[in-house]
């Protein structure tokens, strides 16, 4: 996750986030959907973020990319639902992953860490996100969980 203020963040970082978060999802779906449509079933579970539902300071490009994943997932769901293909979205809140090791804007990283500390320093365990994905996957083909938002109980945003 490449955090930064739109006034000074390198546009190359914007492109990297769009390529990964939006085009990566598009490419992945384009690869797997033809076979799912042909066999009339299958699940696609896309990963987004709560940043795809609300804004966060110093997250402009990241937020834009995750809003894109939300819109893309819902649009494709509408396109393939008649073919019995399930498109689901998981939108985690702050989680303990390596994503923040890529932040190049120290001020943005500091702001994130202050926000995290204001919530007691606790964020979502990645295992909880994985359990959520498995829960969606294990649903019968006749049930499509369109979206799940998941965050640590103490996350205030």
Cite the ranges covered by each PLM segment:
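Residue(s) in the substrate-gating loop at a strand-loop-helix junction
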Residues: 49
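Alpha-helical segment proximal to the catalytic Tyr-Lys
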Residues: 34, 78-81
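C-terminal helical subdomain
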Residues: 89-90, 109-157
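Substrate-binding pocket helix/loop in short-chain dehydrogenase/reductase
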Residues: 5-6, 10-15
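Active-site loop immediately N-terminal to the catalytic Tyr-X3-Lys motif
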Residues: 7, 54-60
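Short, flexible catalytic-loop segment of classical short-chain dehydrogenase/reductase
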Residues: 92-102
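Active-site helix of classical SDR
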Residues: 29, 65
